[in-house]
Amino acid sequence: MTTRYIFVTGGVVSSLGKGIAAASLAAILEARGLNVTIMKLDPYINVDPGTMSPTQHGEVFVTEDGAETDLDLGHYERFIRTKMNRRNNFTTGRIYEEVISKERRGDYLGATIQVIPHITNAIKEKVLAGGEGHDVAIVEIGGTVGDIESLPFLESIRQLGSELGRERTLFMHLTLVPFLGAAGEIKTKPTQHSVKELRSIGIAPDVLVCRGDRAIPANEKAKISLFCNVEERAVISLKDVDSIYKIPALLRSQGLDDLVIKRFNLTCNEADLSEWENVIYQEANPNGEVTIGMVGKYIELPDAYKSVNEALKHAGLKNRVTVNIKYIDSQTVEAKGEEVLQGLDGILVPGGFGERGVEGKIFAAKFARENNLPYFGICLGMQVALIEFARHVAGLEGAHSTEFNPQTPYPVVGLITEWINEEGDVETRHESSDLGGTMRLGAQLCHLKEGTKAAVAYDSATCVERHRHRYEVNNNYIDRLEKAGLVFSGLSSDRKLIEMIELPNHPWFVASQFHPEFTSTPRDGHALFEGFIAASYAYQKRDID
């Protein structure tokens, strides 16, 4: 299969939405019957985002094969059916790590290692490997043209453009076309300078996607075309919209996909965007609304919970309700208690690491349990629900996770290597997909207990979901917690690890060790989120009635 490559760059300012634009174009091409994948090349020195602060970088998106990647890969999976993997995202740090490792092994036979050709060759190899087996591979270059960090990536795609030829490569550049209120006009000069910068390093853009708060008039498009040496029909206006899921139709209406198909000399069907039209209709025509309190520790940057935010919206689409998310700092819950949890239709406690704010999350789980308020716990959200139940229902006063209190008298949650069995020995359990010894990453099978809310929601005896955690439920406390009324509704593939818990006599008190948000999409939703939002809407209606 001959793969065609679309390289997406950005200029003028950051945060223009390259990832959304790339994913939207991919969605149109997929709707035309093409097999499409998307890659993200990140210029930072970190090897991967796994240890980066969520408040600086946003969430870490976990792929099926266990790669910790940029949140843009979440956008890609929500827009197209292709599943991402570790080949879809790599960083400067990863490239340098691999090149230096090869140099230490002597793979370069004593050659002087340089950015060109060794680093650029390594980048090109990864791009070509990532696109293998697909009709079209869209490659997003992180950062902004002009950044020193991006230069090796830009040089690499310049070389690929030359080596593969025009019939297999296309360069798409996103720029900002601002409207100056004082002057009352659109300004194209920033775009002209950005294209000049790009051309100075040997890349001539074939398509310009011009971002702004309004549509660009035809005369301004003609001006941009003239000064940037781009066909007028290849100057695409991408104005701000109230829903990112409108963007595929917006790009389609301006013929961007036709331009790509013609450039690559492909023969394919017209785009069928009916699924996206249905999503937009559902979003625009809700029958009600719910307010969900998200109790977390990274709430100053909503992108830290990007996939959770989107999954809640998807569940709203399926239930025909608008989901309003109220972000609540778990430390504020510690300070003010019930006061900040009033007026909610449901509580969601997402994943997280570290001790800060954990007692606030435990309090939120207790509040939901005692008030029959729908509760959904994810990863740490399941662990705090378990800790709360152990303390206040099962009589295990002082129960905790060894992550937060290594001296707890009742370690109901701990590292899998920390369990002490009845003989007093340290018990070690792991699954073949464990990485790094203690972190469970990637998609794994879960067995669901018949008749539970989890099994009913999935309408299946099993599910496959993605993990990202180090700590597990301590199996030594399962019997005692079950006798107190807790239901362990999900077990790992070997049935040795707890994956889900729930309360039977509660409208919706369900929690999972895995991260279901990573597999939710606007077209398909996700069973657990849909069940949670349905229960939250029913709770609200009960109050009204």
Curated annotation (Swiss-Prot):
Reaction catalysed by this chain?
Answer: UTP + L-glutamine + ATP + H2O = CTP + L-glutamate + ADP + phosphate + 2 H(+); L-glutamine + H2O = L-glutamate + NH4(+); UTP + NH4(+) + ATP = CTP + ADP + phosphate + 2 H(+)
- Check the record and name the SUPFAM superfamilies matching this protein: Class I glutamine amidotransferase-like (SSF52317), P-loop containing nucleoside triphosphate hydrolases (SSF52540)
The UniProt GO MF terms for this protein read: ATP binding; CTP synthase activity; glutaminase activity; identical protein binding; metal ion binding
Q: Which CDD domains match?
A: CTPS_N, GATase1_CTP_Synthase
In short, the EC number is 6.3.4.2
InterPro entries to which the protein is assigned, alphabetical: Class_I_gatase-like, CTP_synthase, CTP_synthase_N, GATASE, GATase1_CTP_Synthase, P-loop_NTPase
Q: How is its activity regulated?
A: Allosterically activated by GTP, when glutamine is the substrate; GTP has no effect on the reaction when ammonia is the substrate. The allosteric effector GTP functions by stabilizing the protein conformation that binds the tetrahedral intermediate(s) formed during glutamine hydrolysis. Inhibited by the product CTP, via allosteric rather than competitive inhibition.
Specify the pathway: Pyrimidine metabolism; CTP biosynthesis via de novo pathway; CTP from UDP: step 2/2
Binding of L-glutamine, residues: G352, L380, G381, M382, Q383, E403, R470
The residues listed in the UniProt record as binding ATP, with positions renumbered to this chain, are S15, L16, G17, K18, G19, I20, D72, K239, D240, V241
Q: What else is known?
A: CTPSs have evolved a hybrid strategy for distinguishing between UTP and CTP. The overlapping regions of the product feedback inhibitory and substrate sites recognize a common feature in both compounds, the triphosphate moiety. To differentiate isosteric substrate and product pyrimidine rings, an additional pocket far from the expected kinase/ligase catalytic site, specifically recognizes the cytosine and ribose portions of the product inhibitor.
> So what family is this one in?
Belongs to the CTP synthase family.
Which function does this protein serve? Catalyzes the ATP-dependent amination of UTP to CTP with either L-glutamine or ammonia as the source of nitrogen. Regulates intracellular CTP levels through interactions with the four ribonucleotide triphosphates.
Kindly provide the name given to this protein in its UniProt entry.
CTP synthase
Q: Which gene encodes it?
A: pyrG
